[in-house]
Amino acid sequence: MSVNGTCEPVNIRRCSCTSEGFSPKKSITSPLSISGRRTSKVLDEAHLPKQLLVQHHHEDGAFLRNISATELVLEVQETANAQQLGAPSALPESRVLVLYTGGTIGMKSSDGVYCPVPGYLPEVLRDIPPLNDRRYVEENYSNMAVRPYSLPPVRHMKKRVVYWIVEYEPLLDSCDMTFDDWIRIATDIKKAYHKYDGFVVLHGTDTLAYTASALSFMMENLGKPVIVTGSQIPVAEVRSDGMENLIGALITAGNFDIPEVCVYFNNKLMRGNRTVKLDNSALEAFDSPNMHPIAQMAINIKVHYDSIFRSDMVAAFTVHENLCRDVGMLRIFPSMTIESVRAFLQPPTRGVILQTFGSGNMPTRRQDIILALKEAINRGVMVVNCSQCLKGQVDVNYATGKILYDIGVIPGSDMTSEAAMAKLCYVLGKDEWDLPMKRSMLQANLRGEMTVATKGAMRELDIIPHLAKCLRVSSSQEVQLLRDIILPPMFCNAAKTNDVETMKALKSSGVNFVATDYNLRTALHVAASNGNLESVKYLLSIGTNVHTKDMFGYNALVCAVKAKAMDCIVAIREAGGFIDATAQKIGVELCLAVYQNDMDLLKCNHAAGIHMGEKDYDNRTALHVAVSLNKPEIVAYLLQCGLDPNEKDDFGMTPIGEAKRRNLKDLETLMMTYKPVELQNGEVFHMD
């Protein structure tokens, strides 16, 4: 189905597993798929347009079917509906979407060399026990056409990771990645954003750091983990870092509140825009030279929550697709010619990463180069100064570095070249910003990509030393454990009592404000459940995740709806909150609200972006129930929301028919004046 409602033929490839992996047997067409449509102009001639492939299960075998990100959301929604009707899992499920772009991790060994084989990775993962619990999948998802994979339960993890894999066609060597591929990955994640708890991007290692950096800037107000990983050895090999990297990425994406684009490699989780490739043959191929890892996988998983970057912008997740292509990297070296510098700075160049010596130093005797840079800056070219060294940062206190600062070169602190390039493309692509704003943004820490001076120091609460003394706790590890046990419940209690000042004091002491209680509830859950608007606003301002779910599957927005706290609902929605319950569950809740004559609850559901036309298990809408119970006020409200009085349930009855059968003339007249309107809801996905 296309956006205008017409059916479009979409190629489906029937495949079978052979010695060469998946191979196409024949091509057929189907009107069932929704073909992907590009919304932005492709500017890179080297870019290869891509399609998403998903493994489709049928009685006759497995298919590789073309699918759009939007259609995949609908398929997974169907899967979620079916799973919830089955036996409950011992662990809550966390859903992860894996986007396979190519790279060594999914390759097949053939005649001693690794090569990409379409469809091979999704099939081979089915038979790797650490990556797929076949029994669990067969018990819970055997009837599904798009069948997921499931990690076995992981010790100390509170959720079971269930994941889906989509494969890009064609598979690419990472050297062939373009800006348009980054845009495609980011927009596919955006389309599926509200239906998954996290995302994993499988990528070749050569340009992995570039992709991670670019995604980190393009994805604005990110509230869920996006983990980029790859490997040096394919996942299906006997000796493989690919299996460990994929397992670690899935565990991280499905279990931890880390709303960043990260790179997972060799038991380390690193901020994406801080990561560089250091070695082309070792398993520890990536490192973060100027920042400690966010998390480390040992016997236990150690997450440094104080290192996680959280946006202080209270806004919904979005993707910025406009990247400036007219940028380049100019590496300074001894005796370089002025002609090469001038040629590099000529239009259409709009941005330059200047890679200088040491701490940002430039040869002071090369006034010709300095003059050429000054002329370029005066005509609007943005020049960012980055060190050629992997560690350390640009320092303008040296005369050789200050001379660049004085002519308008922007100090890049300790940004990697990959991050500086991605940031420059992103900032120059912000057409709504003027030149001074762009210069300011290049010097600001937008995504944790650079070190900046901090304002104020963390202070310890008086209660912790006293408790440590009373409990005879002396070692630093024991004191830290005491803090981790005591402070998070105090933070939740402050949210319950709407004590913002106490929350501020606790945060300044270094409390992990995203820690959960025994029901996996955060302070934002507690504040929303109690309708405490001031606490909700404060928690949102410090980056508390609106998507975190408790053990009952409720996020903070659901808690606010149940509390009928309209102001909290509005605030959480502005921060990107979204209710992703199944359609049938929403339909039952709406019908129940009508039965209870709870107009406030209906209005809160509507304010929360709920699709007001969802149906219950008999395909009855809330309007069916309102008419059968003769509730004129609710009927009028639901009609204003766009519900159709001619909608039939499983018994063939419409709301108008129900009014006629019950001789409810006033309701019949009210509905007869109904004019079809677009159903009002909070749906953010569009069929494209």
Regions found by a protein language model. Give the residues of each.
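Accessory alpha-helical/coil subdomains and C-terminal extensions
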Residues: A90-E93, L99, Y120-N140, Y149-M157, ...
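Conserved ankyrin/ankyrin-like repeat signature
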Residues: T502, E534-S535, D567-C568, D600-L601, ...
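Ankyrin repeat boundary/linker residues
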Residues: D517, D550, A583-Q584, D616, ...
